[in-house]
Curated annotation (Swiss-Prot):
Keywords: ATP-binding, Coiled coil, Covalent protein-RNA linkage, Host membrane, Hydrolase, Membrane, Nucleotide-binding, Nucleotidyltransferase, Phosphoprotein, Protease, RNA-directed RNA polymerase, Serine protease, Transferase, Transmembrane, Transmembrane helix, Viral RNA replication. The modification O-(5'-phospho-RNA)-tyrosine is found at residue 693. Its EC number is 3.4.21.-, 2.7.7.48. One of its GO terms (biological process) is viral translational frameshifting. Pfam families: Astro_1A, Astro_p19, Astro_VPg, Astrovir_pp_1, RdRP_1, Trypsin_2. The keyword Transport does not apply. SUPFAM superfamilies: DNA/RNA polymerases, Trypsin-like serine proteases. GO terms for molecular function: ATP binding; RNA binding; RNA-directed RNA polymerase activity; serine-type endopeptidase activity; serine-type exopeptidase activity. The lineage of its organism: Viruses, Riboviria, Orthornavirae, Pisuviricota, Stelpaviricetes. The record marks 175-176, 419-420, 664-665, 755-756, 933-934 as: Cleavage. It comes from Human astrovirus-1. This is Non-structural polyprotein 1AB. Cleaved by the viral and host proteases. The protease is probably autocatalytically cleaved.
C-alpha cells in the first residue's frame, strides 16, 4: 500500500467503497496490521470523525479527527472501531444502511455456500452408504435358506384319483333322482302337496283372471313385443349361453384335485373336502367358506355334508345345533381359539341351510356362491391397508415417508365419498408476524424462537444445558442468556438490547383452538401451517408435520396471539405445550433453611453411596456395565410407551369429540350451564365502566380491545340464549367468595407468606381458623458476625429522638438511601437543574475535573461563558487552598444554567459523559431489594421517620402549611414536557380551532404551592350542633339508601385487590418502581406483619407521597399553575383500608342500577338511557345539574369522619368491635396526613378527602348523597314521605337529580348554604335547574331528546388527540383512538366539526392499516349495538 493511496481490504471492499475516501488514505501499515477480525471478502465503511475542537492553537488545524471502521465481525456481530493511536477501540456501532444490507446479503450467500458444501458432503456420504447397503443386501439374500420342494407321495396321488373318480360318477350327488332320504318319503309328501294344489284349480284360475290389473296387461304386451322384435342372435344371449360353463363342476374339481396334490400343505383334508362338496351337491359354495374354518370345524362340515347325502333334514338339524352345542361344550378353550371354532361352526350352519334352500328353489348353489364371494370381496376392499411407511431415526423422529405400492382403491373411494359434500363454509385468514421470529442456534442444533414481552421464548430442549445461546435475526448473530426455564418444556431468554425494537407476539387472553397457526424457520425459510387443535391438559395436538428446526415455534390463533410453544411430533399429530402468563415469572427460590436441609440430605446420600461403593468388589464392574445397558434399553422402551400413550390419548380425545353429539342424552330440552361455569348472557356484560370511560377520553382503546368488542357485536346479532336462573345460581358461591358467614381471620396467626407472587386467601368453610401459639420471630443471622455500623448509620441513630423508637421488640437499622449521580437535565425536562443535583460531597478531585484545561475548551465556551469560567476557576483555586468547597455548588449551578440558556452542554454533564464508558444498552433489569438492606426497616409504615432530616428552604409547600422536615428524594419539580407526536402528521389540518384553549399540563414549583388552595374556600360551622334535626334526617336517608351494605365483612389482607402497577410510595419507591416489584421481592410477609402490629395496638404515622396529575385541561389553568394534586400512601396502608372497605365497595358497584352511586356504572349497552329514564320515571317537574368546585378538598373533616363512621356501622357486629381500633387508626391517618413532596419537603394536611386512598370515589358518593339529603331537608323540611319521590345519581362530585319542589331563588340560596354551613364552593352558573332532563349533563355526557349521550366538551377530546400529553406507540393506537372518538360521537349532529374531522382522520389512517385487522370505521349498526345493546337487551 503506497502512502496517500486509499486502503481496501478486499475486492468487494474496493467495489463497494463505503464511507470516506479521505479516511482510507489515513490508514498506515500499523493500523492495518492491528485491524479487528472482520469477515473475509466483505466491505467495510471508513469514517473520519471529528473528536474535538482545539482553540486556540498554533497550527492551522482546529479539528482533531479519528478514523473509524465499521463492518461485520467473524462472530456474526456488527461493530465500529476507532483508532486511538495505539490500537483499535470498540465504540457504539455506527449505522450504515447500505453496509448493513450488503453484509446481510454476503452473510446469506456464505450461509448458502456452506449449506451447499454440507449438502454435497452429505450426498457423497449417502451414496457411499447406499453402495454398502446394496452389497449387504446381496450378501444377506445369499444367506437366506431356500425352501426345499415338497415331495409328492404316491399315496396322495392314488387317494386323489379314487376320490375324483367316485365324485365324477354320474348321479353321484345328493339331489340326483336315484337318491332318497332315509327317514322321510319325499315322493309321498310331494304327491300329497300336488293333489292339494290341484283341487279347485278352475276356481283359482277364474279368481286370478278377475283380479288382473292394467299393469299386468301392459306387462303382457311388453313381453309379446320383446319376443316379436328383439333379434334372436343378440350378443347378450351369446354371453349368457356360454356363462353356464362355469357350472362344469366336474372339470373344475379335477383341476382342484391336481392342484391340491401338488401344493397343499394338508392334501388329505382338502381332497376329502372336495369329494364331500360334490357328494352334497353344494359344489362351488363350499370353497369361499374354507378360510373361516379350523381343522376341527372343517371335519365337522365334511361329516355333515356326507350326512346331507343320505338325509337332508337330519344334516340341516345337526348343522343348526352345532354352533349352539359348540358355545356350550367348547367354553374351556382360550378366547382366540374359542372364537375361531365358533366362527367355523356358524359358517357350516350357514352353508348347509343356505345350500339346501338354494338347491330346493333353483336347483343350484350359484346364488349362495355369489353372495359369499361378494361379502368377502367387500370385506377385502374396505379393510384399512397402510398407505405409507415411516422411516424413523434412533430418537424415534420421522425422517422420511415412503408410500406403499398397494393402493386400496375401494377404501379410498368410500373415504372420499364420505368426505365429499356441498361446501358449507370458507377457510378463515390468519395473522402472522414473521418479524417476531428468530432462529436459536446451539451446539446441539437449531430451533425457532419468538419475541414476547422482554424475552425470547423457545423450547427448553432446544436450549438444553447451555447458559448462553446464539440468536440469529435477519442474518445477524446475537448472544442471549437463558433467563428462566419453568417445569414445562419452555425456555425464556433475555432479549439483547439491539433486538428490542423488533415486533412482539402477545399472549392470547381468550384462547381459541379451532384454528391454530404454526410459524417456524426451516433452513432459513419461513414455513406456515394451519390446523385444528385439541387440548389435552397442558398440551395441544394438531395434524402438522414437524421438520428439523421447528421446535420452539409459536402456535398462534387466527389473530396472531400466542397459544402454545411447538415441541415435536410423534407421527401424525404435532404437539405443543400451552404457555400462560404465569410461566414468564420464575418461582421464588427456596429459603436458606430449605437449602441447608437439602444440602444435608445430599451429603447423607453421598456418604451412603461412598460406603456402599467401598464394599463393592471390583469384579462386579462388568455386570454393572451390563446393567447400565439394560437401563438404557428400558429408557428407550419407556420413551416408546410414553409416545404411544400420548398418541392413544390424542386418539381418544378426538373420537370422544366426534361422538359427543351422538352420545349426549337428550330429554326434551337443553340443559344450560348445569355443572359448568358460564356467563350470564341475558344480563349481559358491561362494555365500559365509568373508570374505563374516563381513561378512554384520554388514551383511547388498543387494538385487542377493539377486536374483542367487534367480536362481541357479531356474536350478539343472533341474540342471547335462554337460561334458567336456578341453573345459573351456585349454592356453594355466596357472591363473596373470600369470606363466609361465620369465618374470622386472626392476624396474630404466624403464617409464612414469603412467596414471590400474591396468592388469594384460602377458601374456607364455616370454620374458625385456629391461631397457632404466638412465637416471637427472630431474624436468621447467617453471617455469624456483627458488622460494624457505618458512620452514616451512627449519625442517624444519634439524631433519632427517643420517642421515635416506639417498637423495642423490632430492632431496625436505618437504611442508607441509594446515591445516584447528579443528573442536571435528565429529570428536569429542560428547566434549570435541581439544586440537589449539585449539592453533593465535593472534594479536590471533583473541583479539578469540573472544568477542563484551557486548550480543551471550545471557541463557543470562550465567547459565551468566558467571564463565568474565569470566575469559577478562581473559586476552585480558592476552595482547594482553603479546603472549603461550600461555594462550589452555587458557582457550578450558575455556570451550567448559563450554558443551558446558550444551548451548550453543561460542565457537570461533560464530566459524567467523560467518565462514563460507552455501553451497549441492554434490557432493563428486574427490580430487586437492595443489597445493604440491614434489617429491612423500609417495610414498616413509619420507616420514613428514621430518614427524616431537619427542615430546609421552602420551595413547594405554602406558607400556611407546616414544614416538618426534609427527606432525601430524587424527583423532578419542573415539567414543561409537551410531546410532539410524529404520527399526527398523517392527520389533516383541522378547520375547527376551539381545541386550542386546552393543552397538556406543565408545571414548576409554583404549581405545587397552588395545588394546596383546594383545601380552602370558607370555614365550616359546627353543623351537627347547629342543625341536629337536619343532620339526623340526612343520616336516616343515608342508612336507608345504603342498607344493602348491612352485615358486610372485613376480609383478609391477602384477598384484597388493588392496582399493583402503582408507586409503592416513600421509602419503598427508592428501591422498587411498582408495588408488583415489591411483592415479587418480599411477598405478603410485610403486609401481614404490619397489620398484626396495628391490630396489637401500635399506631404508626403513615407518609403520603404527593405529585401533580398529567392531563388535558384549559390553557388558562396551566398559565395560572392550577394543577390537580394526587397523593398516594404506602401500599400496606392502602391494603389495610381494602381489608376494611373492599366488601362494601364491591357491593356498591353491583347496585348502580338501583342505588345513587354510579362507580362501576357503564353508559354502554343502554346503560346511559336506562339511568336517565330512571330519573324521568319519578314524575317530578324539576331536574338539577350540580357542579362543585374543589369538591374533594373542601369536604369538612367532621363530615368525612362521620361518613366513615356510618360505613363502619354497616360492618358485621362481631368484626365491628374486634377491628374498631384498626379502623380508627386508619381514619385518623386519612384526616391527618403527613405528605412528602418531590422537593423532599414534608408537611401535614388535615383537610379534605385524599384523592389516592382506597375508597375515594365511594366516600365522595356517600358525602354527596348526605349533602343532598341535608339540602332537601333545609329547603323542604325533614319530610320523609316527600323524600321518597326524590332521586339522584352521583359519581364523585358529579350530580344529576330530580326533585318534586324547588324554591324560586334556589341557586342563590343553595350556594349560600354550602358556603356558610359547610365551607364548600359552588360557583354561580354551575347550578342548572330545568323542567326537563334534556340538555343537562352527567359524567361528561349531555342528554339529548332521546335520552342518549352526547359529549359535553368535544373540543377537549380533540385537544387530547392533537395536543396529547403522551406519545402514542404506533399507528394502530392512533387508529384505535380515532375509533373511540367515533364511538363517543355516535349521537352528535352529522355536521358537527368534531365528528366530521374524526371521519376524515379515519379515512387517512385506514389507508395505512389495511392489514392490521382493525376496522376502517365502525358502522352505524355497530355503534348502535354498543350504545343500545343487543336484540334482547335493547333499551331504546
Amino acid at each position: 500500500m503506497a502512502y496517500g493511496e486509499p486502503y481496501y481490504s478486499s475486492k468487494p471492499d474496493k467495489d463497494f467503497n463505503f464511507g470516506s475516501t479521505m479516511a482510507r488514505r489515513q490508514m498506515t501499515p500499523t493500523m492495518v496490521t492491528k485491524l479487528p477480525k472482520f469477515v473475509r471478502n466483505s466491505p467495510q465503511a471508513y469514517d473520519w470523525i471529528v473528536r474535538g475542537l482545539i482553540f486556540p492553537t498554533i497550527g492551522k488545524t482546529y479539528f482533531q479527527r479519528v478514523v473509524v471502521i465499521t463492518g461485520g465481525l467473524e462472530d456474526g456481530t456488527y461493530g465500529s472501531f476507532a483508532f486511538d493511536g495505539k490500537e483499535w477501540v470498540g465504540i457504539y456501532p455506527i449505522e450504515h444502511l447500505n453496509l448493513m444490507s450488503s453484509l446481510k446479503l454476503i452473510h446469506k450467500a456464505n450461509a448458502l455456500q456452506e449449506r451447499l458444501r454440507l449438502s454435497q458432503e452429505e450426498k457423497a456420504t449417502l451414496a457411499l452408504d447406499v453402495q454398502f447397503l446394496q452389497h449387504e443386501n446381496v450378501r444377506l439374500k445369499e444367506m437366506i435358506p431356500k425352501p426345499e420342494p415338497r415331495k409328492i407321495q404316491m399315496k396322495w396321488i392314488i387317494m386323489g384319483a379314487v376320490l375324483t373318480f367316485l365324485s365324477l360318477i354320474p348321479g353321484g350327488y345328493a339331489h340326483s333322482q336315484t337318491n332318497n332320504t332315509i327317514f322321510t318319503d319325499m315322493i309321498a309328501a310331494c304327491k300329497y302337496s300336488t293333489e292339494t294344489l290341484t283341487e279347485n284349480l278352475d276356481l283359482r284360475i277364474k279368481l286370478a283372471l278377475a283380479n288382473i290389473t292394467i299393469s299386468d296387461k301392459l306387462d303382457a304386451v311388453r313381453q309379446i313385443l320383446n319376443f316379436a322384435f328383439v333379434p334372436r342372435a343378440h350378443w347378450l344371449r351369446t354371453v349368457f349361453y356360454y356363462i353356464h360353463y362355469y357350472e362344469m363342476w366336474n372339470i373344475f374339481m379335477f383341476v382342484l384335485a391336481i392342484g391340491t396334490v401338488m401344493r397343499s400343505a394338508r392334501p388329505g383334508t382338502d381332497l376329502v373336502t372336495l369329494a364331500t362338496s360334490h357328494l352334497s351337491g353344494f359344489r362351488m359354495a363350499v370353497l369361499p367358506t374354507i378360510p373361516f374354518h379350523t381343522t376341527m370345524t372343517l371335519w365337522v362340515m365334511n361329516t355333515l355334508m356326507v350326512c346331507y347325502y343320505f338325509d337332508n333334514l337330519l344334516a340341516i338339524t345337526l348343522a343348526i345345533l352345532a354352533p349352539i352345542l359348540g358355545i356350550i361344550f367348547l367354553c374351556f378353550m382360550e378366547d382366540s381359539n374359542y372364537v375361531s371354532q365358533i366362527r367355523g361352526l356358524i359358517a357350516t350352519a350357514v352353508l348347509i341351510a343356505g345350500g339346501h334352500a338354494c338347491l330346493t328353489l333353483t336347483g343350484t348353489t350359484t346364488s349362495l356362491f355369489v353372495v359369499i364371494l361378494t361379502c368377502r370381496f367387500i370385506r377385502m376392499a374396505t379393510v384399512f391397508i397402510g398407505t405409507r411407511f415411516e422411516i424413523r431415526d434412533a430418537n424415534g423422529k420421522v425422517v422420511a415417508t415412503v408410500p406403499t405400492r398397494i393402493k386400496n382403491v375401494a377404501f379410498d373411494f368410500f373415504q372420499k365419498l364420505k368426505q365429499s359434500g356441498v361446501r358449507v363454509g370458507v377457510n378463515e385468514f390468519v395473522v402472522i408476524k414473521p418479524g417476531a421470529l428468530c432462529v436459536i442456534d446451539t451446539p446441539e442444533g437449531k430451533g425457532t424462537g419468538f419475541f414476547s414481552g422482554n424475552d425470547i421464548v423457545t423450547a427448553a430442549h432446544v436450549v438444553g444445558n447451555n447458559t448462553f445461546v446464539n440468536v440469529c435475526y435477519e442474518g445477524l448473530m446475537y448472544e442471549a442468556k437463558v433467563r428462566y426455564m419453568p417445569e414445562k418444556d419452555i425456555a425464556f431468554l433475555t432479549c439483547p438490547g439491539d433486538l428490542h425494537p423488533t415486533a412482539r407476539l402477545k399472549l392470547s387472553k381468550n384462547p381459541d383452538y379451532s384454528c391454530v397457526t404454526v410459524m417456524a424457520y426451516v433452513n432459513e425459510d419461513l414455513v406456515v401451517s394451519t390446523a385444528a387443535a385439541m387440548v389435552h391438559g397442558n398440551t395441544l395436538s394438531y395434524a402438522v408435520r414437524t421438520q428439523d428446526g421447528m421446535s420452539g415455534a409459536p402456535v398462534c390463533d387466527k389473530y396472531g396471539r400466542v397459544l402454545a410453544v411447538h415441541q415435536t411430533n410423534t407421527g401424525y399429530t404435532g404437539g405443543a405445550v400451552i404457555i400462560d402468563p404465569a410461566d414468564f415469572h420464575p418461582v421464588k427460590a427456596p429459603s436458606q433453611v430449605e437449602l441447608l436441609k437439602e444440602e444435608i440430605e445430599r451429603l447423607k446420600a453421598q456418604l451412603n453411596s461412598a460406603t456402599e461403593n467401598a464394599t463393592t468388589v471390583v469384579t462386579q464392574q462388568p455386570s454393572a456395565a451390563l446393567e447400565q445397558k439394560s437401563v438404557s434399553d428400558s429408557d428407550v422402551v419407556d420413551l416408546v410407551r410414553t409416545a404411544m400413550e400420548r398418541e392413544m390419548k390424542v386418539l381418544r380425545d378426538e373420537i370422544n369429540g366426534i361422538l359427543a353429539p351422538f352420545l349426549q342424552k337428550k330429554k326434551g330440552k337443553t340443559k344450560h350451564g348445569r355443572g359448568r361455569v358460564r356467563r350470564n348472557l341475558r344480563k349481559g356484560v358491561k362494555l365500559l365502566t365509568e373508570e374505563e370511560y374516563r381513561e378512554l377520553l384520554e388514551k383511547g382503546l388498543d387494538r385487542e380491545t377493539f377486536l374483542d368488542l367487534i367480536d362481541r357485536i357479531i356474536g350478539e346479532r343472533s341474540g342471547y340464549p335462554d337460561y334458567d336462573d336456578e341453573d345459573y345460581y351456585d349454592e356453594d358461591d355466596d357472591g363473596w367468595g373470600m369470606v363466609g358467614d361465620d369465618v374470622e381471620f386472626d392476624y396474630t396467626e404466624v403464617i409464612n407468606f414469603d412467596q414471590a407472587k400474591p396468592i388469594p386467601a384460602p377458601r374456607t368453610t364455616k370454620q374458625k381458623i385456629c391461631p397457632e401459639p404466638e412465637v416471637e420471630s427472630q431474624p436468621l443471622d447467617l453471617s455469624q458476625k456483627k458488622e460494624k455500623q457505618s458512620e452514616y448509620e451512627q449519625q442517624v441513630v444519634k439524631s433519632t429522638k427517643p420517642q421515635q423508637l416506639e417498637h423495642e421488640q423490632q430492632v431496625v437499622k436505618p437504611i442508607k438511601p441509594q446515591k445516584s449521580e447528579p443528573q442536571p437535565y435528565s429529570q428536569t425536562y429542560g428547566k434549570a437543574p435541581i439544586w440537589e443535583s449539585y449539592d453533593f460531597d465535593w472534594d479536590e478531585d471533583d473541583a479539578k475535573f469540573i472544568l477542563p484545561a484551557p486548550h480543551r475548551l471550545t471557541k463557543a465556551d470562550e465567547i459565551v461563558l468566558g467571564s463565568k469560567i474565569v470566575k469559577l476557576r478562581t473559586i476552585i483555586e480558592t476552595a482547594i487552598k482553603t479546603q472549603n468547597y461550600s461555594a462550589l455548588p452555587e458557582a457550578v449551578f450558575e455556570l451550567d444554567k448559563a450554558a443551558y440558556e446558550a444551548g451548550l452542554e453543561g460542565f457537570l454533564q461533560r464530566v459524567k459523559s467523560k467518565n462514563k464508558a460507552p455501553e451497549k444498552q441492554g434490557p432493563k433489569k428486574l427490580q430487586r431489594a437492595p443489597e445493604d438492606q440491614g434489617a429491612q426497616n423500609y417495610h414498616s409504615l413509619d420507616a420514613w421517620k428514621l430518614l427524616l432530616e431537619p427542615p430546609r428552604e421552602r420551595r413547594c409547600v405554602p406558607a400556611n402549611f407546616p414544614l416538618l422536615g426534609h427527606l432525601p428524594i430524587n424527583r423532578p419539580i419542573f415539567d414543561d414536557k409537551k410531546p410532539r407526536d410524529d404520527l399526527l402528521g398523517l392527520l389533516p389540518e383541522p378547520t375547527w380551532h376551539a381545541f386550542e384553549e386546552y393543552g397538556p399540563t406543565t408545571w414548576g414549583p409554583q404549581a405545587f404551592i397552588k395545588s394546596f388552595d383546594k383545601f380552602f374556600y370558607a370555614e365550616p360551622i359546627d353543623f351537627f350542633s347547629e342543625y341536629p334535626q337536619l343532620c339526623a334526617f340526612a343520616d336516616w336517608a343515608t342508612y336507608r339508601e345504603f342498607r344493602y351494605l348491612e352485615d358486610t365483612r372485613v376480609i383478609h389482607i391477602t384477598a384484597t385487590e388493588k392496582n399493583t402497577d402503582s408507586t409503592p410510595a416513600y421509602p419503598k419507591m427508592n428501591y422498587f418502581d411498582t408495588e408488583e416489584n415489591y411483592l415479587e421481592a418480599h411477598g405478603w410477609a410485610p403486609y401481614i406483619r404490619e397489620f398484626t402490629r396495628v391490630y396489637k395496638g401500635d399506631k404508626p404515622e403513615v407518609l403520603w407521597y404527593l405529585f401533580l396529575k398529567k392531563e388535558i385541561i384549559k390553557e388558562e389553568k396551566i398559565r395560572n399553575s392550577d394543577i390537580r394534586q394526587i397523593v398516594c400512601a404506602d401500599p400496606i396502608y392502602t391494603r389495610i383500608g381494602a381489608c376494611l372497605e373492599a366488601h362494601q365497595n364491591a357491593l356498591m358497584k353491583q347496585h348502580t342500577d338501583t342505588s345513587v352511586g354510579q362507580c362501576g356504572w357503564s353508559p354502554m349497552e343502554g346503560g346511559f338511557k336506562k339511568t336517565m329514564q330512571r330519573l324521568v320515571n319519578k314524575g317530578n317537574k324539576h331536574f338539577i345539574e350540580f357542579d362543585w368546585t374543589r369538591y374533594d378538598g373542601t369536604i369538612p373533616p367532621a363530615l368525612f369522619k362521620h361518613i366513615k363512621e356510618i360505613r363502619w356501622n354497616f360492618i358485621n357486629k362481631d368484626q365491628r368491635e374486634k377491628y374498631r381500633h384498626v379502623h380508627e387508626w386508619y381514619v385518623n391517618n386519612l384526616l391527618n396526613r403527613h405528605v412528602l413532596l418531590p422537593s423532599g419537603e414534608v408537611t401535614l394536611q388535615t383537610r379534605g378527602n385524599p384523592s389516592g386512598q382506597f375508597s375515594t370515589t365511594m366516600d365522595n358518593n356517600m358525602v354527596n348523597f348526605w349533602l343532598q339529603a341535608f339540602e332537601f331537608a333545609y329547603f323542604n323540611g325533614p319530610d320523609r314521605d316527600l323524600w321518597k319521590t326524590y332521586d339522584t345519581v352521583v359519581y364523585g362530585d358529579d350530580r344529576l337529580s330530580t326533585t318534586p319542589s324547588v324554591p324560586d331563588d334556589y341557586e342563590e340560596r343553595v350556594i349560600t348554604m354550602y358556603r356558610d354551613i359547610f365551607g364548600m364552593w359552588v360557583k354561580p352558573g354551575k347550578v342548572i335547574c330545568r323542567d326537563s332532563i334534556v340538555g343537562l349533563s352527567f359524567c361528561g355526557f349531555t342528554v339529548n331528546e332521546n335520552l342518549e349521550p352526547v359529549p359535553t366538551s368535544p373540543e377537549k377530546l380533540m385537544a387530547s388527540l392533537l395536543k396529547p400529553y403522551k406519545i402514542l406507540p404506533d399507528l394502530e393506537s392512533l387508529h384505535g383512538k380515532l375509533l373511540c372518538y367515533q364511538l363517543l360521537a355516535a349521537f352528535m349532529a352529522e355536521d358537527h366539526p368534531f365528528k366530521v374531522y374524526v371521519e376524515h382522520c379515519l379515512s387517512r389512517t385506514a389507508k395505512q392499516l389495511r392489514d392490521s385487522g382493525l376496522p376502517a370505521r365502525l358502522t352505524e349498526e355497530q355503534l348502535h349495538r354498543i350504545w343500545r345493546g343487543g336484540p334482547k337487551k335493547c333499551d331504546g
